[in-house]
Design a protein with these regions (language model features):
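Membrane-interface helix-boundary motifs at transmembrane edges
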Residues: 70-82, 138-145, 233
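Hydrophobic alpha-helical membrane segments
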Residues: 29-36, 124-128, 147-193
Length: 241
């Protein structure tokens, strides 16, 4: 009888130790990811200004919280997240085509006096497409890091609403000149053919990517909703009922 009690007690101790170790690992992973996001935002801020803080900073911290509450505790079923993630990625790639054709990078350069060129934009787009393919594989195999990168990608898509604000902002470089300009920006990079989409000067309310932005935002919102609904607490509650 004592042997059974001892075994049960030992099993409880091992289970408690295992759960404590798991919680420590999760916390350490979360802290490391949060530090990485803050470090990257700081690095890009020093080189490019406030734009990366808006695009990556806020969404990045939200992604850390979301990932911790959902995917890190229990990876989302690949049957749920992988198709939705790929649909979002496809819509985003179509959205990038409009941005490229509208010279999004030079327009941003003129707006904020930073060194983004069409060439850099294309390189980033190709690298991002490759990264999204790898992330989808990681989601299929339920990898925690893939879950975070997917969360970051989805939340940064919500930052696309800034496209509706940018036409209202006065450009940092020659705001009163309607035609494209070519010059060196604050970082010393030469950027050619920087359009002006300031609505007070052009008379039109548009910014590159505005027409197709819904293709990136709506699937991202739905994916976040489905992942949140599938989080462990909701699943457990539904099973107990």
């Amino acid at each position: 009888m004592r042997t059974r009690k001892n075994r049960a007690r030992d099993a409880k101790i091992r289970l408690g130790d295992s759960m404590a170790t798991m919680m420590k690992e999760r916390l350490a992973c979360t802290v490391a990811i949060a530090a990485l996001v803050i470090g990257c935002v700081t690095f890009f801020y020093l080189g490019l200004g406030l734009v990366p803080v808006y695009i990556v900073g806020g969404p990045g911290l939200l992604a850390v919280f979301f990932w911790y509450r959902t995917y890190l505790k229990q990876p989302t079923d690949p049957a749920i997240i992988v198709p939705l993630f790929l649909i979002t990625a496809a819509g985003f790639e179509i959205h990038l085509v409009e941005e490229y054709l509208g010279h999004y990078a030079p327009t941003i350069s003129r707006l904020f006096n930073i060194g983004w060129t069409d060439r850099v934009f294309v390189v980033i787009c190709f690298l991002l497409a490759a990264a999204l393919c790898l992330v989808s594989v990681g989601l299929y195999y339920r990898k925690a890091v893939a879950g975070f990168v997917a969360s970051l990608f989805l939340f940064t898509r919500l930052a696309e609403v800034g496209l509706f604000v940018f036409p209202l902002l006065r450009p940092a470089l020659q705001p009163d000149v309607a035609h494209p300009i070519s010059q060196s920006v604050a970082s010393g990079t030469f950027v050619g053919d920087m359009p002006n989409h300031y609505w007070r000067i052009t008379g039109s309310y548009y910014f590159p990517g505005m027409y197709t932005v819904a293709l990136a935002i709506l699937p991202a919102l739905y994916t976040l909703y489905r992942v949140w609904q599938a989080r462990p607490s909701v699943t457990t509650a539904s099973v107990s009922q």
